[in-house]
């Protein structure tokens, strides 16, 4: 009896740790075609797809690891898979390497997650917890819009739709298969998901 209670307690504990980052789906369950050739070419890659996404993510890994603790903290706080946050950071700013004084996109995008000052008021330091929290909350708001728009989609499909909407807005997501048409290089969610799956394998 005592052993059963211990096992039940352990199961509850493990369940809690899983749910702390899995509220919006599990990134490894999402299908992805990876980066388009349009995304791969500026990275000087002569191939496209998941392999290209993984290579770009690998190049960003050392810079990303500086923020690993922070990314995991924000992910657990907001119940979002830290690997997804890392995937977005890689795509948006190459983990900060593409930024000038914390800004990108011709001075419109702020921080690691490139919060657009035309739509939001950026908060915190470009590489700090408040910024990552704001970026992740924007992602969550997009996921919730997709949940409302496509209630019959699986959790993972809604997560992928939310990632796509993070780039081009929920109005751009019209179907699962074509959600990335209209995003930057027409591959945003597929590329981010493939990068996130790479980061998942590296402890995010």
Swiss-Prot record:
GO function term, MF aspect, one: lysozyme activity
First-tier enzyme category under EC: hydrolase
Keyword set includes Hydrolase: yes
SS bonds (residue pairs): 23-79, 37-48
Catalytic reaction(s) noted: Hydrolysis of (1->4)-beta-linkages between N-acetylmuramic acid and N-acetyl-D-glucosamine residues in a peptidoglycan and between N-acetyl-D-glucosamine residues in chitodextrins
Function (record text): Has bacteriolytic activity against M.luteus.
Name of the protein this chain belongs to: Lysozyme G
Lineage: Eukaryota, Metazoa, Chordata, Craniata, Vertebrata
């Amino acid at each position: 009896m005592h052993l059963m209670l211990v096992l039940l307690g352990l199961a509850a504990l493990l369940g809690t740790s899983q749910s702390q980052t899995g509220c919006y789906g599990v990134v490894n369950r999402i299908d992805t075609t990876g980066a388009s050739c349009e995304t791969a070419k500026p990275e000087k890659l002569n191939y496209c797809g998941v392999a290209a996404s993984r290579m770009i993510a690998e190049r960003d890994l050392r810079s990303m690891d500086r923020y690993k603790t922070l990314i995991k903290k924000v992910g657990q706080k907001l119940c979002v898979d830290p690997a997804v946050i890392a995937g977005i950071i890689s795509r948006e700013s190459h983990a900060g390497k593409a930024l000038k004084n914390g800004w990108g996109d011709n001075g419109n995008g702020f921080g690691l997650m490139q919060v657009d000052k035309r739509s939001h008021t950026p908060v915190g330091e470009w590489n700090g917890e408040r910024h990552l929290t704001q970026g992740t909350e924007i992602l969550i708001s997009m996921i919730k819009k997709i949940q409302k728009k496509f209630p019959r989609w699986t959790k993972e499909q809604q997560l992928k739709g939310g990632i796509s909407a993070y780039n081009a807005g929920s109005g751009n997501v019209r179907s699962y298969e074509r959600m990335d048409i209209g995003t930057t290089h027409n591959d945003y969610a597929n590329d981010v998901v493939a990068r996130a799956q790479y980061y998942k394998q590296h402890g995010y």
